Amino acid sequence: MLCPMWETIRTSDEILRFMEKMCYFHDSCIKEMHYISGAYVGEGFAMYPLNDLRVLRMVIQRQCAKNAMIEMEFQGLKCLKLAPADEDYTCEILDSTMIIKDGNIYWCDCGDLSEADLGAYEGTLICAAGFRWRSIENHMGEKEFYHSAV
């Protein structure tokens, strides 16, 4: 599996180029998510109760030859609202929105949302302080990308 270097997105112009490169995630699906809080309980049962990492990694697979599978990393996660479709409905993403508001990056699984729409949006919404992504090659299909070594 080839995992190229991460590409960090910081500006509205970089978001626009990224979204155009991904065709606004048309004909895509959220395959997997992995969250790292930073909090843990150690071997002696002492707790480190601080969410000082808050990193969400999300794998998207697309029906497109270029960048068919990407991993998106949301750093300093502030909000994750996950609204998965159940098995009676299809879950493909037809369009998406990514914007910067108040210094945070928002990603939603619906297109043409404005800053004013974010609070009322009932689909999947992610808000984080930072964002980066990378293309993942030779890993299409149902096999899990994030798997435990235990």
What do these predicted regions represent?
Residues 1-150:
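Surface-exposed, interaction-prone regions used to assemble/regulate multi-protein complexes
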